[in-house]
UniProtKB/Swiss-Prot annotation:
EC identifiers of the protein: 3.5.2.-
Record GO terms (molecular function): 5-oxoprolinase (ATP-hydrolyzing) activity; metal ion binding
Cofactor dependence: Zn(2+)
Recorded name of the encoding gene: capB
Function text: Component of a caprolactamase involved in the degradation of caprolactam, an industrial compound mainly used in the production of Nylon 6. Catalyzes the ATP-dependent hydrolysis of the caprolactam ring to form 6-aminocaproic acid (6-ACA). The beta subunit is responsible for hydrolytic lactam ring opening. The enzyme cannot use 5-oxoproline.
Lineage summary: Bacteria, Pseudomonadati, Pseudomonadota, Gammaproteobacteria, Pseudomonadales
Binding of Zn(2+), residues: 41, 99, 102, 124
Organism the protein comes from: Pseudomonas jessenii
Assembly description: The caprolactamase is a heterotetramer composed of two alpha subunits (CapA) and two beta subunits (CapB).
Domain notes: The tetrameric structure and the presence of a connecting tunnel suggest that the activated lactim moves from the CapA active site to the CapB active site without release to solvent.
Statement: the UniProt record of this protein carries the keyword Hydrolase: yes
Consequence when changing residue 99 to A: Loss of activity. Shows significantly reduced thermal stability
Name assigned to this protein: Caprolactamase subunit beta
Domain of life assignment: Bacteria
Description of activity control: Activity is dependent on the presence of ATP and bicarbonate. The requirement for bicarbonate may be related to allosteric activation through conformational effects, but it is also conceivable that carboxyphosphate is formed and acts as a mediator in caprolactam activation, forming carboxy- or phospholactim.
GO biological process: glutathione metabolic process
Length: 581
């Protein structure tokens, strides 16, 4: 164990956290797209020279887990050809990226000629080229039909901006001004982080800072090992189901085999062969899914760095499978599907080991991208993911209900829906409704968080809509004996309502065009419940009904609570009903 002065350790740790927070604020305040500045679909991290992650932000989990293998891949790609002033860009899943819309910037930090740190920023660009706006192409049979792949490439070389390379990238993207603005914001964030780190090195020197970082990683390792020692040794298995894509694949299953031995864990993933559809997951993304499933169980205190995973080994199964995809498998939906299902499989396995530790599953992402030409602004092209459309409910745990409208499992509460008024200001749409959905939270002693309903209309133009995600066929999984009776309210939905009132309902990923006067309605599922619903206190169920979160029928059918037409609790009927069940 390192002997580091605890005061110095606390100051260095605080300085690292400040550097990361300043990176986040820079992105929020200087980026161009609503996906960045409203929804915060980005993540920042700091790495040391090894390169190992020394600090992750409280950002998007699916980004952060994949950064660990991606950083090593990028650094190894350039080897000794990394110089002061270089900036590297990358999105390719074949190089441990997540999906090609998540573009990552890596800035090496040199101090007195020595590489000491990396500042890293990953964010979801609203477009990456390809035949479908926003990149989600449900008809893609290969990765080449999804958009621009960017293997590790230097956008700045020894401090010089490479305009030819940057122009090549941006020329292949829709709504170029938005993508360029977000790319520049990423550069600003990495540079701000670099400045803070150099100030830290000026104060304490390389050796002292490295000693503190080693201790912080060791501390995270000790926390995780202590948790695993409290879990009974054994083999645990969990299987989660991917919904029918409508492409002749049927339902697909992912199984996680978790072995706990002392203070170590080994995770083996079993998945079917990769498919000619955009739900394949390459290794970097799948590793992140395993880590997310583990962290739904672990609940360890900070610091959060690569030390957490020293005692965890991951085997994704044979190459060419759904969770260990190889070129040219299409993949762009992978950060939601199958990643959320993969994380669920790990969570289900760990629930067998220690059910009191797990969180029920969160609602899966079930959202839309929109694109068109803005009639208010010289018909300029726009394209964006509507982040308010992917706000599902959080899972409950042994002590509390799931949070409503907290975002999908892949983001674990870090994704913001953004202000509806700012969405309308930024894009030519009218929001008719944005609300929580009654009976959408999974039933349990602790109820799952409610999902959301968004209704929008294009204004004075035809709007392309891309529906993606899951949760439209299978309800969110609960935990510890939770069970649902009302299934329909707990499912996501995508509805195209025409001017005459006729509606088209979609349960799979789809492309459609909406005209002025028509509505696109997107419903996100709620989170899973925890524990037996019949153990939920009567007063709590009554409060849920009065707040519109549970219907009178839902109270009776799922919780055994009888409420009359005046909204009053019938205790005698309730006790009889619960006794009969």
């Amino acid at each position: 164990m390192n002997t580091v002065d605890p005061i110095t350790l606390a100051v260095v740790r605080g300085a690292l956290e400040t550097a990361q927070r300043e990176m986040t604020l820079t992105l929020e305040k200087t980026s161009r797209s609503s996906v960045f500045n409203l929804a915060h679909d980005y993540s920042n991290a700091l790495f040391d020279h090894l390169p190992e992650m020394i600090l992750q932000g409280q950002d998007i989990p699916i980004h952060l887990g994949s950064l660990i293998p991606a950083m090593k891949c990028v650094a190894g790609f350039f080897g000794d050809e990394i110089a002061e002033g270089d900036v590297i860009y990358h999105n390719d899943p074949a190089y441990m990226g997540s999906h090609i819309l998540d573009c990552c910037m890596y800035k090496p930090v040199f101090y007195k000629g020595e590489l000491v740190f990396w500042t890293v920023c990953k964010g979801h660009l609203t477009d990456i080229g390809g035949p479908v706006p926003a990149g989600y192409n449900p008809d893609a049979k290969e990765i080449y039909a999804e958009g621009l792949r960017i293997p590790p490439v230097k956008l700045w070389a020894q401090g010089q901006r490479r305009e030819d390379v940057i122009n090549l990238l941006l020329t292949n993207m829709r709504a170029r001004a938005y993508q360029e603005g977000d790319l520049n914001a990423q550069y600003g964030a990495c540079s701000v982080g670099e400045r803070h780190l150099i100030e830290l090195l000026d104060r304490y020197g390389v050796d002292q800072v490295r000693a503190c970082i080693t201790e912080l990683k060791d501390m995270a390792d000790r926390h995780m090992r202590a948790l695993l020692r409290d879990v009974p040794d054994g083999f645990y298995s969990g299987t989660a189901i991917l919904e029918d894509s409508g492409h002749g694949l049927g339902e697909l299953s992912i199984t996680a085999q978790v072995e706990i031995r002392g203070d170590e864990a080994h995770v083996l993933i079993e998945s079917p062969p990769q498919v000619p559809y955009f739900i394949n997951s390459y290794a970097g993304n799948s590793i992140s899914g395993v880590y997310l499933g583990l962290m739904m169980f672990a609940q360890v205190p900070p610091p959060y760095n690569e030390g957490l995973y020293r005692c965890v080994s991951v085997d994704l199964g044979p190459s060419g499978t759904l969770c260990n995809a190889q070129e040219p498998a299409p993949h762009v939906n992978c950060t939601t599907t199958p990643m959320e299902t993969l994380a669920d499989a790990v969570r289900l396995a760990l629930e067998q080991a220690a059910p009191e530790r797990v969180t029920a599953s969160w609602g899966h992402a079930s959202g839309i991208n929109i694109a068109g030409h803005d009639p208010r602004n010289n018909n300029d092209e726009y394209v964006t993911m509507v982040l308010a459309s992917v706000i599902s409910g959080a899972g409950a745990n042994k002590a509390m209900d799931g949070w409503p409208a907290c975002g999908p499992l892949c983001c674990f509460g870090a994704l913001m829906s953004g202000d509806i008024e700012l969405l309308e200001y930024s894009y030519p749409v009218l929001i008719h409704r944005y609300s929580l959905m009654t009976d959408s939270g999974g039933a349990g002693e602790f109820r799952g968080g409610s999902g959301t309903r968004l209704e929008l209309e294009p204004l004075k133009h035809a709007m392309t809509v891309v529906g993606f995600g899951e949760g439209r066929q299978l309800p969110t999984a609960g935990a510890a004996g939770a069970k649902n009776v009302l299934l329909e309210p707990k499912l996501g939905r995508l509805i195209h309502r025409h001017v005459d009132g006729e509606e088209d309902h979609y349960i799979q990923n789809t492309l459609l065009t909406a005209q002025p006067g028509e509505r696109v309605i997107n419903v996100n599922p709620g989170g899973g419940g925890y524990g037996d619903p019949l153990r939920r206190p009567l007063a709590t169920v009554l409060a849920d009904v009065r707040n519109g979160l549970v219907s009178i029928d839902g109270a009776r059918l799922e919780y055994g609570v009888v409420i009359d037409g005046n909204g009053q609790l019938d205790e005698a009927a309730t006790h009889a009903h619960r006794a009969a069940h």
